[in-house]
């Protein structure tokens, strides 16, 4: 029974194919148990704990799924994370309620409370201001294009519904989210990380917020506006002495742009209210649009002001609504193919269809070529303009950088040459008004043409310029056609009442068919979302399995930590004992110190007693003895000095002699070795000479003997000449 209790209080921390690894909380030990030998209560407890652990993991996931707005934003975030960089991921994680309304997106007074109804008078007033506005079209970076494409892909259903079908408050909120995200992309991609991860930094007005210098290069790479401003001031300096004033709608971007320009050795400063009275001006003042009233006097009276630059379209609309008159030249930076470009092209027709056109055109421009294959007027427009690559984003990064630098160089040259408007070096921006999705073309279409266009629009992923028609416009066209037919029948009796009913029935049938196709497309979108939800569930399940493995590893680490704590407790007890021994030793040392102090006191008393007798001698005697001792000490010192010098001399002599003796010994040894060598050579030579002499003597003796023999022979040969006459001839012949 106790063993079962031990098992019940145990935890299975690991599992193999045939065994369980069990950690016992009673004795704090691990052991392996075969599965067939493992009691069933232990397995039941293990399974219950495992099920409880899985429930704990699934609880936060279910809570996430129950949060309708937040979960939708997480779907957006997950969708945008696919094959994207870190800087592209987190820009749609805020709640929908946190995004500003249409009135805040376009800071122009509205006539009523309708979300998408604005004042035509206000936009006409701002567009017809007294100052001259020159638009500088800059290509979007690859990152901005990719983010816009992903953004349109995600909001495709809402965009299609908003442009072709009836839109309720939920669709309008999503469209507000889409518009705000498109504005942020047009400003700078780095804005999202700051707004999502650190909202206080994005809203902060502190101009001394430090930025990571390693990321400075990414600011110009991700936005051609940063690169344009850098190249513009590099081409202007140092000969150009006038100052510029730049308006920007976001405080964080203002801080970032200021510090980035300073890092490029450009004199840039943030504008403050107290700067209106200063007489010294940098190369460029950077001002947030909400501070525009404080700069009104400066813009009107500064003689050194060259131009007022608007970084984004929001800043332009906000500033021009509060400052209707600007005396200087106005330059407006616009990304080609962005929402800024669309607003610029449609601001002359600011009516109820304004946002429908903006959303539809931006969706069309940010879609792929396959998605825009049905938009024939789109390709015709690009062929006429010649800016196909700039709008659809088929240019490379190096080409975008080179084009931006050329634009900045041309603008700088134009400013240096006197700002002649007739010689403005940049071509006008492409007019996107022909891509209108909520207004009719040159010729008014018939009712059947409108219905056919409405049916065709259901087959495309994104509404093209031909296929998208607003529901209000469609209804008005149908009503106008019906009214026209009715009035004609009354005046000329051309149509009968039966024919009018047939026309109305045909129109209703076409509308129902379009609605069916719209619902089918919506069903496909829901199926895609369901597929993504299933994939997300699989990812979460794999993540839970990874967490289980991590928990098992953490359990092992916990056991190691417990063992470490036990060892530390033992060390603590040893330390306590050691401290007790040290405290005892300290007490003994204190007692020893006290005894030594007593001895010192006793010795001091004895010393005082001895000094009494020393003090009885007279000072004169002591001084005389001291003088004698000093003289004696001086003599001994001199003697010691002399002896030391003698000793040093003797030592030096001895050392020199020793050195010389060692050298002589080495020389003698060397000479002895040389002598022995020469003796050996001499003896060898003598032996060779002796051998040579002996051999020579022997050779000479042999030669002498041979000569003697020869002489004898010769003598014998010469004897007949001196032979006596009485010698016999036979003897002579014999000789």
From Swiss-Prot:
Signal peptide range in chain numbering: none
GO BP of this protein: meiotic chromosome segregation; meiotic telomere clustering; telomere capping; telomere maintenance; telomere maintenance via telomerase; telomere-telomerase complex assembly
Predominant location: nucleus
Keywords: Chromosome, Chromosome partition, Coiled coil, Nucleus, Telomere
Subcellular location: Nucleus, Nucleoplasm; Chromosome, Telomere
Keyword GTP-binding: no
Coiled coil: 514-719
GO function term, MF aspect, one: molecular adaptor activity
GO CC entries: chromosome, telomeric repeat region; nucleoplasm; nucleus; shelterin complex; subtelomeric heterochromatin; telomere cap complex
Assembly description: Interacts (during meiosis) with pcp1. Interacts with clr3, pot1, taz1 and tpz1.
Described function: Component of the meiotic bouquet that facilitates meiotic nuclear reorganization of the telomeres to the centrosome. Links telomeres to the meiotic centrosome component pcp1. Essential for the formation of normal telomere clusters during meiotic prophase. Required for telomere length regulation and chromosome segregation. Required for proper positioning of nucleosomes at heterochromatic loci and for transcriptional gene silencing (TGS) function of the Snf2/Hdac-containing repressor complex (SHREC).
Name of this protein: Coiled-coil quantitatively-enriched protein 1
Organism, as annotated: Schizosaccharomyces pombe (strain 972 / ATCC 24843) (Fission yeast)
Protein's gene: ccq1
């Amino acid at each position: 029974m106790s063993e079962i209790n031990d098992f019940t209080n145990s935890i299975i921390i690991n599992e193999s194919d045939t065994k369980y690894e069990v950690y016992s909380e009673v004795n704090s030990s691990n052991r392996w148990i075969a599965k067939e030998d493992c009691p069933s209560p232990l397995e039941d407890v293990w399974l219950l704990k495992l099920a409880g652990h899985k429930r704990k993991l699934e609880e936060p996931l279910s809570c996430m799924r129950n949060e309708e707005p937040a979960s939708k934003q997480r779907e957006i975030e997950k969708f945008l994370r696919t094959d994207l960089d870190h800087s592209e991921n987190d820009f749609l994680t805020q709640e929908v309620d946190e995004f500003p309304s249409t009135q805040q997106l376009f800071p122009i007074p509205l006539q009523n409370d309708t979300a998408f109804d604005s004042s035509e008078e206000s936009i006409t007033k701002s567009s017809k201001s007294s100052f001259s506005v020159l638009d500088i079209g800059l290509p979007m970076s690859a990152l901005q294009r990719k983010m816009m494409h992903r953004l349109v892909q995600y909001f495709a259903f809402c965009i299609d519904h908003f442009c072709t079908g009836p839109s309720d408050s939920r669709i309008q909120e999503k469209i507000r989210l889409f518009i705000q995200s498109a504005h942020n992309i047009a400003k700078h991609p780095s804005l999202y990380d700051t707004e999502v991860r650190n909202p206080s930094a994005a809203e902060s007005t502190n101009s001394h917020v430090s930025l990571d210098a390693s990321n400075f290069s990414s600011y110009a790479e991700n936005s051609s506006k940063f690169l344009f401003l850098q190249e513009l001031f590099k081409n202007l300096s140092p000969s150009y002495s006038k100052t510029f004033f730049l308006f920007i709608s976001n405080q964080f971007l203002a801080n970032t742009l200021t510090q980035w320009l300073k890092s490029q050795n450009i004199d840039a400063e943030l504008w403050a209210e107290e700067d209106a009275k200063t007489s010294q001006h940098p190369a460029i003042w950077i001002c947030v649009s909400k501070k525009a009233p404080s700069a009104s006097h400066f813009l009107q009276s500064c003689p050194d002001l060259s131009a007022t630059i608007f970084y984004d379209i929001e800043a332009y609309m906000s500033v021009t609504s509060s400052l209707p008159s600007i005396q200087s030249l106005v330059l407006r930076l616009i990304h080609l193919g962005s929402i800024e470009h669309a607003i610029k092209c449609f601001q002359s027709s600011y009516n109820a269809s304004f946002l429908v056109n903006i959303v539809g055109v931006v969706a069309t421009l940010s879609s792929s070529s396959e998605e825009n294959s049905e938009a024939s007027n789109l390709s015709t427009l690009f062929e006429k303009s010649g800016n196909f690559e700039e709008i659809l984003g088929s240019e490379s990064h190096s080409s975008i950088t080179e084009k931006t630098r050329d634009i900045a160089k041309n603008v700088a040259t134009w400013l240096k040459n006197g700002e002649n408007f007739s010689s403005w070096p940049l071509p006008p921006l492409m007019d996107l008004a022909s891509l209108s999705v909520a207004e009719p073309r040159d010729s008014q279409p018939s009712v059947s043409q409108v219905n056919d266009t409405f049916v065709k629009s259901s087959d495309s992923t994104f509404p093209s310029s031909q296929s998208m028609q607003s529901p209000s416009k469609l209804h008005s066209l149908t009503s106008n056609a019906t009214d026209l037919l009715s009035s004609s029948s009354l005046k000329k009796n051309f149509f009968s009442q039966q024919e009018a009913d047939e026309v109305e029935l045909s129109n209703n049938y076409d509308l129902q068919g379009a609605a069916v196709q719209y619902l089918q497309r919506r069903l496909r979108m829901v199926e895609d979302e369901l597929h993504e939800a299933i994939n997300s569930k699989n990812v979460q399940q794999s993540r839970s399995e990874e967490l289980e493995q991590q928990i098992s590893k953490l359990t092992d680490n916990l056991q190691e930590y417990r063992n470490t704590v036990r060892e530390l407790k033992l060390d603590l007890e040893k330390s306590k004992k050691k401290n007790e021994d040290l405290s005892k030793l300290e007490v003994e040392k204190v007692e020893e110190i006290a005894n030594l102090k007593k001895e010192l006191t006793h010795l001091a008393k004895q010393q005082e007693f001895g000094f009494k007798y020393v003090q009885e001698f007279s000072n004169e005697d002591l001084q005389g003895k001291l003088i004698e001792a000093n003289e004696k000490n001086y003599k001994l010192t001199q003697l010691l000095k002399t002896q030391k010098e003698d000793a040093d001399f003797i030592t030096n002599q001895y050392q020199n002699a020793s050195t010389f003796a060692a050298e002589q010994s080495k020389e003698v040894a060397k000479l002895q070795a040389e002598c022995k060598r020469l003796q050996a050579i001499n003896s060898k030579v003598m032996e060779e000479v002796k051998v040579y002499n002996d051999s020579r003597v022997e050779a000479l003796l042999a030669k002498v003997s041979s000569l003697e023999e020869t002489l004898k022979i010769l003598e014998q040969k010469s004897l007949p000449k001196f032979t006596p006459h009485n010698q016999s001839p036979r003897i002579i012949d014999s000789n």
